[in-house]
UniProtKB/Swiss-Prot annotation:
SUPFAM superfamilies: TolB, N-terminal domain (SSF52964), Tricorn protease N-terminal domain (SSF69304)
Organism: Rhodopseudomonas palustris (strain HaA2)
Gene, per the UniProt record: tolB
GO cellular component terms listed in the entry, alphabetical order: periplasmic space
Highest taxon of the lineage: Bacteria
Entry's family note: Belongs to the TolB family.
Keywords: Cell cycle, Cell division, Periplasm, Signal
The keyword Cell cycle is annotated on this UniProt entry: yes
Protein's UniProt name: Tol-Pal system protein TolB
Length: 449
Protein backbone atom coordinates (compact mmCIF):
# COMPACT_ATOMS: atom_id res chain seq x y z
CA UNK A 1 0.00 0.00 0.00
CA UNK A 2 1.39 3.42 -0.91
CA UNK A 3 1.51 6.21 1.62
CA UNK A 4 0.11 9.57 0.41
CA UNK A 5 2.56 12.44 0.08
CA UNK A 6 3.43 13.93 3.44
CA UNK A 7 4.66 17.42 4.31
CA UNK A 8 8.43 17.60 4.45
CA UNK A 9 8.50 18.24 8.19
CA UNK A 10 5.98 16.81 10.64
CA UNK A 11 6.93 16.68 14.30
CA UNK A 12 5.49 14.23 16.80
CA UNK A 13 3.29 16.88 18.41
CA UNK A 14 1.65 17.65 15.07
CA UNK A 15 1.36 14.02 14.03
CA UNK A 16 0.55 12.21 17.26
CA UNK A 17 -2.40 14.15 18.56
CA UNK A 18 -2.28 12.02 21.68
CA UNK A 19 -0.61 8.87 22.90
CA UNK A 20 -1.15 6.76 25.98
CA UNK A 21 0.29 3.60 27.46
CA UNK A 22 -2.07 0.72 26.74
CA UNK A 23 -3.84 -0.85 29.69
CA UNK A 24 -1.77 -3.52 31.38
CA UNK A 25 1.40 -2.79 29.40
CA UNK A 26 4.74 -2.52 31.10
CA UNK A 27 6.60 0.78 31.01
CA UNK A 28 9.11 0.90 28.19
CA UNK A 29 12.70 0.38 29.19
CA UNK A 30 15.77 -1.81 28.77
CA UNK A 31 15.28 -5.52 28.18
CA UNK A 32 15.58 -7.75 31.26
CA UNK A 33 16.45 -11.39 31.85
CA UNK A 34 12.87 -11.97 33.00
CA UNK A 35 11.79 -11.62 29.38
CA UNK A 36 12.74 -15.26 28.84
CA UNK A 37 13.60 -16.13 25.29
CA UNK A 38 12.32 -12.88 23.78
CA UNK A 39 15.60 -11.07 24.02
CA UNK A 40 18.17 -10.09 21.41
CA UNK A 41 21.74 -10.20 22.72
CA UNK A 42 23.69 -7.66 20.67
CA UNK A 43 27.39 -8.41 20.42
CA UNK A 44 30.15 -7.57 17.97
CA UNK A 45 30.05 -11.11 16.61
CA UNK A 46 27.28 -13.09 14.96
CA UNK A 47 23.78 -12.54 16.29
CA UNK A 48 21.07 -15.18 15.96
CA UNK A 49 18.02 -13.22 14.72
CA UNK A 50 15.01 -13.44 17.04
CA UNK A 51 11.99 -15.23 15.49
CA UNK A 52 9.06 -12.80 15.73
CA UNK A 53 5.48 -12.98 14.43
CA UNK A 54 3.79 -9.81 13.17
CA UNK A 55 0.21 -10.48 11.98
CA UNK A 56 -1.70 -7.81 10.07
CA UNK A 57 -3.14 -5.27 12.46
CA UNK A 58 -6.83 -5.84 13.16
CA UNK A 59 -9.03 -3.33 11.32
CA UNK A 60 -11.83 -1.52 13.10
CA UNK A 61 -13.73 -1.35 9.80
CA UNK A 62 -13.26 -3.21 6.49
CA UNK A 63 -11.93 0.01 4.93
CA UNK A 64 -9.00 -0.07 7.37
CA UNK A 65 -7.83 -3.56 6.36
CA UNK A 66 -5.32 -2.18 3.87
CA UNK A 67 -3.84 0.19 6.44
CA UNK A 68 -3.61 -2.60 9.02
CA UNK A 69 -1.75 -4.78 6.54
CA UNK A 70 0.50 -1.91 5.52
CA UNK A 71 1.54 -1.11 9.09
CA UNK A 72 2.39 -4.76 9.79
CA UNK A 73 4.41 -4.97 6.57
CA UNK A 74 6.45 -1.83 7.35
CA UNK A 75 7.21 -3.13 10.85
CA UNK A 76 8.18 -6.51 9.39
CA UNK A 77 10.50 -4.92 6.83
CA UNK A 78 12.12 -2.64 9.42
CA UNK A 79 12.88 -5.42 11.88
CA UNK A 80 14.07 -7.80 9.18
CA UNK A 81 16.43 -5.22 7.66
CA UNK A 82 18.01 -4.63 11.07
CA UNK A 83 19.39 -8.18 10.92
CA UNK A 84 18.40 -8.77 14.55
CA UNK A 85 14.96 -10.23 13.90
CA UNK A 86 13.59 -13.05 11.75
CA UNK A 87 9.92 -12.31 11.00
CA UNK A 88 7.95 -15.51 10.46
CA UNK A 89 5.97 -15.87 7.23
CA UNK A 90 2.29 -15.17 7.85
CA UNK A 91 1.40 -18.33 5.90
CA UNK A 92 2.74 -20.34 8.85
CA UNK A 93 0.43 -18.73 11.43
CA UNK A 94 -1.97 -21.06 13.24
CA UNK A 95 -4.01 -18.46 15.15
CA UNK A 96 -5.81 -15.55 13.48
CA UNK A 97 -5.71 -12.48 15.72
CA UNK A 98 -9.15 -10.82 15.82
CA UNK A 99 -9.12 -9.06 19.19
CA UNK A 100 -5.93 -7.63 20.66
CA UNK A 101 -7.58 -7.10 24.07
CA UNK A 102 -7.70 -10.88 24.57
CA UNK A 103 -4.37 -12.67 25.28
CA UNK A 104 -3.18 -14.72 22.30
CA UNK A 105 -3.18 -18.52 22.23
CA UNK A 106 0.53 -18.80 23.01
CA UNK A 107 0.73 -22.51 22.17
CA UNK A 108 -0.24 -21.59 18.60
CA UNK A 109 2.78 -19.31 18.40
CA UNK A 110 5.28 -21.59 20.14
CA UNK A 111 4.29 -24.27 17.63
CA UNK A 112 5.78 -22.14 14.83
CA UNK A 113 8.85 -21.26 16.95
CA UNK A 114 7.91 -17.61 17.48
CA UNK A 115 9.65 -16.09 20.50
CA UNK A 116 7.95 -12.69 20.30
CA UNK A 117 4.55 -11.65 18.97
CA UNK A 118 3.25 -8.24 17.89
CA UNK A 119 -0.50 -7.62 17.74
CA UNK A 120 -2.18 -4.39 16.77
CA UNK A 121 -5.37 -2.63 15.76
CA UNK A 122 -6.19 0.33 13.50
CA UNK A 123 -9.51 2.06 14.19
CA UNK A 124 -11.04 5.05 12.43
CA UNK A 125 -12.43 7.58 14.91
CA UNK A 126 -15.58 9.67 14.50
CA UNK A 127 -13.48 12.80 13.98
CA UNK A 128 -11.55 11.16 11.12
CA UNK A 129 -8.42 10.41 13.10
CA UNK A 130 -6.81 7.00 13.06
CA UNK A 131 -6.25 5.20 16.35
CA UNK A 132 -3.27 2.85 16.25
CA UNK A 133 -2.63 0.33 19.05
CA UNK A 134 -0.04 -2.38 19.49
CA UNK A 135 0.98 -5.04 22.01
CA UNK A 136 4.32 -6.84 22.25
CA UNK A 137 4.26 -10.31 23.82
CA UNK A 138 6.89 -12.73 25.08
CA UNK A 139 5.55 -16.01 23.69
CA UNK A 140 7.50 -18.26 26.08
CA UNK A 141 6.30 -16.55 29.28
CA UNK A 142 2.98 -15.12 28.08
CA UNK A 143 4.12 -11.75 29.41
CA UNK A 144 3.10 -8.50 27.74
CA UNK A 145 6.28 -6.52 27.26
CA UNK A 146 4.97 -3.27 25.81
CA UNK A 147 1.86 -1.56 24.53
CA UNK A 148 1.03 1.87 23.22
CA UNK A 149 -1.76 3.68 21.43
CA UNK A 150 -1.56 6.68 19.12
CA UNK A 151 -4.06 9.01 17.46
CA UNK A 152 -3.04 10.54 14.15
CA UNK A 153 -4.22 11.62 10.73
CA UNK A 154 -4.70 8.59 8.44
CA UNK A 155 -2.03 9.71 5.96
CA UNK A 156 0.67 9.30 8.63
CA UNK A 157 0.17 5.56 9.08
CA UNK A 158 3.66 4.78 7.76
CA UNK A 159 5.32 7.02 10.35
CA UNK A 160 3.28 5.29 13.07
CA UNK A 161 4.69 1.97 11.82
CA UNK A 162 8.25 3.32 12.16
CA UNK A 163 7.58 4.56 15.70
CA UNK A 164 6.12 1.19 16.72
CA UNK A 165 9.15 -0.51 15.14
CA UNK A 166 11.42 1.60 17.34
CA UNK A 167 9.41 0.64 20.45
CA UNK A 168 9.74 -3.06 19.62
CA UNK A 169 13.45 -2.76 18.80
CA UNK A 170 14.20 -0.95 22.06
CA UNK A 171 12.16 -3.31 24.20
CA UNK A 172 13.81 -6.43 22.81
CA UNK A 173 17.39 -5.18 22.45
CA UNK A 174 17.72 -2.59 25.21
CA UNK A 175 18.97 -0.04 22.67
CA UNK A 176 17.28 2.85 20.91
CA UNK A 177 15.80 2.17 17.49
CA UNK A 178 16.48 4.12 14.31
CA UNK A 179 13.46 3.54 12.08
CA UNK A 180 11.67 6.86 12.66
CA UNK A 181 14.33 8.80 10.80
CA UNK A 182 15.10 10.19 7.36
CA UNK A 183 17.97 10.27 4.90
CA UNK A 184 18.99 13.16 2.70
CA UNK A 185 20.98 12.17 -0.38
CA UNK A 186 21.95 13.14 -3.91
CA UNK A 187 19.56 11.75 -6.52
CA UNK A 188 21.36 11.15 -9.83
CA UNK A 189 19.84 10.66 -13.27
CA UNK A 190 20.97 10.72 -16.89
CA UNK A 191 24.12 9.42 -18.63
CA UNK A 192 27.45 9.52 -16.84
CA UNK A 193 28.76 12.46 -18.88
CA UNK A 194 25.59 14.54 -18.33
CA UNK A 195 24.51 13.46 -14.88
CA UNK A 196 21.78 15.56 -13.22
CA UNK A 197 22.07 15.74 -9.43
CA UNK A 198 19.23 16.79 -7.14
CA UNK A 199 18.96 17.10 -3.39
CA UNK A 200 16.45 14.48 -2.21
CA UNK A 201 14.87 13.40 1.07
CA UNK A 202 13.31 10.06 2.02
CA UNK A 203 12.38 7.85 4.96
CA UNK A 204 15.22 5.59 6.10
CA UNK A 205 13.61 2.63 4.30
CA UNK A 206 13.50 4.42 0.93
CA UNK A 207 9.82 5.47 1.05
CA UNK A 208 8.34 8.96 0.63
CA UNK A 209 11.05 10.40 -1.61
CA UNK A 210 10.96 14.20 -2.04
CA UNK A 211 13.12 16.31 -4.33
CA UNK A 212 14.34 19.53 -2.76
CA UNK A 213 16.22 21.03 -5.73
CA UNK A 214 15.48 20.99 -9.47
CA UNK A 215 18.85 19.74 -10.70
CA UNK A 216 19.88 22.86 -12.61
CA UNK A 217 23.02 23.18 -10.44
CA UNK A 218 25.36 20.53 -9.03
CA UNK A 219 24.73 19.76 -5.34
CA UNK A 220 26.97 17.77 -2.97
CA UNK A 221 27.48 16.73 0.68
CA UNK A 222 24.07 17.34 2.28
CA UNK A 223 23.99 17.08 6.08
CA UNK A 224 21.15 17.26 8.63
CA UNK A 225 20.86 19.65 11.54
CA UNK A 226 20.33 18.02 14.96
CA UNK A 227 16.72 19.27 14.91
CA UNK A 228 16.18 17.48 11.54
CA UNK A 229 14.51 20.68 10.26
CA UNK A 230 17.46 22.04 8.27
CA UNK A 231 20.01 20.71 5.81
CA UNK A 232 23.35 22.22 4.92
CA UNK A 233 24.89 21.34 1.57
CA UNK A 234 27.26 22.53 -1.15
CA UNK A 235 26.12 23.84 -4.53
CA UNK A 236 28.07 24.64 -7.69
CA UNK A 237 26.11 27.47 -9.27
CA UNK A 238 27.47 30.58 -10.90
CA UNK A 239 31.04 31.13 -9.73
CA UNK A 240 32.63 29.34 -6.79
CA UNK A 241 30.77 26.60 -4.91
CA UNK A 242 28.88 27.87 -1.89
CA UNK A 243 27.50 26.35 1.28
CA UNK A 244 23.74 26.67 1.70
CA UNK A 245 21.27 26.20 4.53
CA UNK A 246 17.91 24.69 3.47
CA UNK A 247 14.83 24.81 5.71
CA UNK A 248 12.82 21.62 5.15
CA UNK A 249 9.63 23.06 6.63
CA UNK A 250 9.53 26.26 4.56
CA UNK A 251 11.53 25.22 1.50
CA UNK A 252 13.62 28.39 1.83
CA UNK A 253 17.41 28.46 1.58
CA UNK A 254 20.21 30.90 2.32
CA UNK A 255 23.94 31.11 1.71
CA UNK A 256 26.04 30.33 4.78
CA UNK A 257 28.48 33.22 4.57
CA UNK A 258 29.96 34.84 1.49
CA UNK A 259 33.51 33.57 1.59
CA UNK A 260 36.17 34.24 -1.03
CA UNK A 261 37.23 31.05 -2.79
CA UNK A 262 35.53 27.69 -2.49
CA UNK A 263 33.81 26.17 0.55
CA UNK A 264 33.38 22.43 1.11
CA UNK A 265 32.01 19.67 3.36
CA UNK A 266 29.73 21.61 5.74
CA UNK A 267 28.40 19.91 8.86
CA UNK A 268 26.39 21.07 11.88
CA UNK A 269 27.65 21.09 15.45
CA UNK A 270 25.72 18.82 17.86
CA UNK A 271 23.77 21.80 19.23
CA UNK A 272 22.90 23.05 15.74
CA UNK A 273 24.26 26.53 16.47
CA UNK A 274 27.39 26.28 14.31
CA UNK A 275 28.51 24.92 10.98
CA UNK A 276 32.02 23.60 10.50
CA UNK A 277 33.43 23.49 6.97
CA UNK A 278 36.53 23.60 4.80
CA UNK A 279 37.41 26.84 2.99
CA UNK A 280 39.94 27.02 0.18
CA UNK A 281 42.21 30.03 0.20
CA UNK A 282 45.47 30.39 -1.70
CA UNK A 283 45.57 26.77 -2.80
CA UNK A 284 45.17 25.40 0.72
CA UNK A 285 42.00 24.20 2.42
CA UNK A 286 41.60 24.81 6.13
CA UNK A 287 38.84 24.26 8.65
CA UNK A 288 36.58 27.08 9.81
CA UNK A 289 33.55 27.20 12.07
CA UNK A 290 30.71 29.71 11.70
CA UNK A 291 28.32 30.75 14.44
CA UNK A 292 24.90 30.78 12.76
CA UNK A 293 23.55 33.50 15.04
CA UNK A 294 26.35 36.04 14.91
CA UNK A 295 27.68 34.91 11.49
CA UNK A 296 31.18 35.20 12.96
CA UNK A 297 33.80 32.79 11.61
CA UNK A 298 36.72 31.22 13.48
CA UNK A 299 39.67 29.55 11.81
CA UNK A 300 40.56 26.17 13.31
CA UNK A 301 43.53 25.00 11.21
CA UNK A 302 46.29 26.84 9.39
CA UNK A 303 48.49 24.47 7.42
CA UNK A 304 49.90 24.30 3.87
CA UNK A 305 47.74 21.24 3.28
CA UNK A 306 44.20 20.20 2.47
CA UNK A 307 42.11 19.85 5.63
CA UNK A 308 38.51 18.84 4.93
CA UNK A 309 35.52 16.64 5.91
CA UNK A 310 35.26 17.72 9.57
CA UNK A 311 32.85 15.96 11.96
CA UNK A 312 32.10 16.72 15.62
CA UNK A 313 32.14 14.22 18.46
CA UNK A 314 28.68 13.89 20.08
CA UNK A 315 29.77 15.99 23.07
CA UNK A 316 31.16 18.68 20.71
CA UNK A 317 34.51 18.55 22.51
CA UNK A 318 36.52 17.21 19.54
CA UNK A 319 36.44 17.01 15.78
CA UNK A 320 37.80 14.44 13.39
CA UNK A 321 38.82 15.45 9.89
CA UNK A 322 40.75 14.42 6.80
CA UNK A 323 44.13 15.96 5.99
CA UNK A 324 47.02 15.27 3.62
CA UNK A 325 49.51 17.14 5.81
CA UNK A 326 51.45 13.88 6.18
CA UNK A 327 51.66 13.25 2.43
CA UNK A 328 48.43 11.35 1.75
CA UNK A 329 44.93 11.71 3.20
CA UNK A 330 44.68 10.47 6.78
CA UNK A 331 42.29 11.00 9.70
CA UNK A 332 43.14 13.40 12.51
CA UNK A 333 41.43 14.34 15.77
CA UNK A 334 41.79 17.66 17.57
CA UNK A 335 39.94 19.84 20.11
CA UNK A 336 36.83 21.48 18.64
CA UNK A 337 38.31 24.89 19.39
CA UNK A 338 41.44 24.10 17.37
CA UNK A 339 44.92 23.24 18.57
CA UNK A 340 47.15 20.21 18.29
CA UNK A 341 45.83 17.57 15.88
CA UNK A 342 46.60 13.90 16.45
CA UNK A 343 46.75 11.44 13.58
CA UNK A 344 44.73 8.28 14.29
CA UNK A 345 44.87 6.33 10.99
CA UNK A 346 48.02 4.32 10.27
CA UNK A 347 46.98 1.45 8.01
CA UNK A 348 47.99 0.97 4.40
CA UNK A 349 46.24 3.23 1.91
CA UNK A 350 44.57 6.60 2.37
CA UNK A 351 41.63 7.55 4.60
CA UNK A 352 38.83 10.04 3.94
CA UNK A 353 35.26 11.13 4.81
CA UNK A 354 35.49 10.51 8.58
CA UNK A 355 32.28 10.79 10.60
CA UNK A 356 31.79 10.38 14.33
CA UNK A 357 29.19 7.91 15.62
CA UNK A 358 26.25 9.38 17.59
CA UNK A 359 27.29 7.02 20.40
CA UNK A 360 30.82 8.41 20.39
CA UNK A 361 32.40 4.96 20.27
CA UNK A 362 33.53 4.84 16.62
CA UNK A 363 34.66 6.98 13.72
CA UNK A 364 33.62 5.66 10.31
CA UNK A 365 35.73 6.30 7.21
CA UNK A 366 36.40 5.52 3.57
CA UNK A 367 39.71 3.73 2.95
CA UNK A 368 41.35 3.55 -0.46
CA UNK A 369 44.08 1.11 -1.39
CA UNK A 370 44.89 -1.66 -3.83
CA UNK A 371 42.26 -0.49 -6.27
CA UNK A 372 39.51 -0.89 -3.65
CA UNK A 373 37.38 1.55 -1.67
CA UNK A 374 36.38 0.19 1.74
CA UNK A 375 34.03 1.40 4.46
CA UNK A 376 35.39 0.88 7.96
CA UNK A 377 35.29 1.99 11.56
CA UNK A 378 37.88 2.63 14.26
CA UNK A 379 37.83 3.89 17.82
CA UNK A 380 38.51 7.61 18.33
CA UNK A 381 42.06 6.82 19.46
CA UNK A 382 42.72 4.93 16.21
CA UNK A 383 42.59 1.45 17.70
CA UNK A 384 40.32 -1.40 16.65
CA UNK A 385 40.20 -0.61 12.93
CA UNK A 386 37.66 -2.84 11.20
CA UNK A 387 36.74 -3.00 7.51
CA UNK A 388 32.99 -3.56 7.12
CA UNK A 389 32.72 -3.80 3.33
CA UNK A 390 34.95 -3.20 0.32
CA UNK A 391 34.62 -3.02 -3.44
CA UNK A 392 35.44 -1.03 -6.54
CA UNK A 393 34.08 2.23 -5.13
CA UNK A 394 32.40 2.49 -1.72
CA UNK A 395 32.28 5.92 -0.12
CA UNK A 396 30.52 8.35 2.20
CA UNK A 397 29.54 6.51 5.40
CA UNK A 398 26.83 7.94 7.65
CA UNK A 399 25.58 6.52 10.96
CA UNK A 400 22.01 5.63 11.91
CA UNK A 401 20.74 7.57 14.96
CA UNK A 402 21.60 4.68 17.31
CA UNK A 403 25.10 4.22 15.89
CA UNK A 404 24.61 0.51 15.09
CA UNK A 405 24.10 0.75 11.32
CA UNK A 406 25.96 2.60 8.57
CA UNK A 407 24.67 3.77 5.21
CA UNK A 408 27.04 4.46 2.30
CA UNK A 409 27.03 4.58 -1.47
CA UNK A 410 28.59 2.22 -3.99
CA UNK A 411 29.44 3.20 -7.57
CA UNK A 412 30.15 0.27 -9.91
CA UNK A 413 31.69 2.58 -12.52
CA UNK A 414 31.02 2.79 -16.23
CA UNK A 415 27.59 3.94 -17.35
CA UNK A 416 25.91 2.52 -14.25
CA UNK A 417 25.34 4.90 -11.37
CA UNK A 418 25.72 4.68 -7.60
CA UNK A 419 23.33 3.04 -5.13
CA UNK A 420 22.84 3.27 -1.38
CA UNK A 421 23.59 0.39 0.98
CA UNK A 422 23.45 -0.28 4.71
CA UNK A 423 25.71 -2.49 6.81
CA UNK A 424 25.86 -3.27 10.53
CA UNK A 425 28.87 -2.05 12.55
CA UNK A 426 29.82 -5.72 12.91
CA UNK A 427 30.17 -5.95 9.11
CA UNK A 428 27.07 -8.14 8.77
CA UNK A 429 23.77 -7.67 6.98
CA UNK A 430 24.77 -5.58 3.96
CA UNK A 431 21.60 -4.52 2.14
CA UNK A 432 20.72 -2.23 -0.73
CA UNK A 433 18.40 0.70 0.03
CA UNK A 434 15.70 1.17 -2.63
CA UNK A 435 15.71 4.55 -4.40
CA UNK A 436 13.90 5.70 -7.57
CA UNK A 437 17.17 6.20 -9.45
CA UNK A 438 20.89 6.44 -8.84
CA UNK A 439 21.79 7.78 -5.39
CA UNK A 440 24.94 8.96 -3.61
CA UNK A 441 26.24 10.93 -0.62
CA UNK A 442 23.65 9.92 2.02
CA UNK A 443 23.31 11.57 5.43
CA UNK A 444 21.15 10.00 8.13
CA UNK A 445 19.02 12.25 10.35
CA UNK A 446 18.67 11.92 14.11
CA UNK A 447 15.40 10.41 15.30
CA UNK A 448 12.58 12.71 14.24
CA UNK A 449 11.37 15.02 16.99
Amino acid sequence: MDCPNMPLHINRRQMLLSAATAAGALALGPARDAFGQARVQITEGNVAPLPIAIPNFVAGTPSDNEVGGGVAQVITNNLKRSGLFAPIDQAAYVEKITNIDVPPQFKSWTSINAQALVTGRMTRQSDGRLKAEFRLWDVATGQQLAGQQYFTSPEYWRRIAHIISDQIYERLTGEKGYFDSRVVFIDESGPADRRVKRLALMDQDGANVRYLTRGSDLVLTPRFSPSTQEITYMEFGQGDPKVYLFNIETGQREIVGNFPGMSFAPRFSPDGQRIIMSLQQGGNSNLFVMDLRSKSTTRLTDTPAIDTSPSYSPDAARICFESDRGGKPQIYVMPASGGQAQRISFGDGSYSTPVWSPRGDYIAFTKQGGGQFAIGIMKPDGSGERILTSGFHNEGPTFAPNGRVLMFFRDPGGNAGPSLFTVDVSGRNELRVPTPGYASDPAWSPLLS
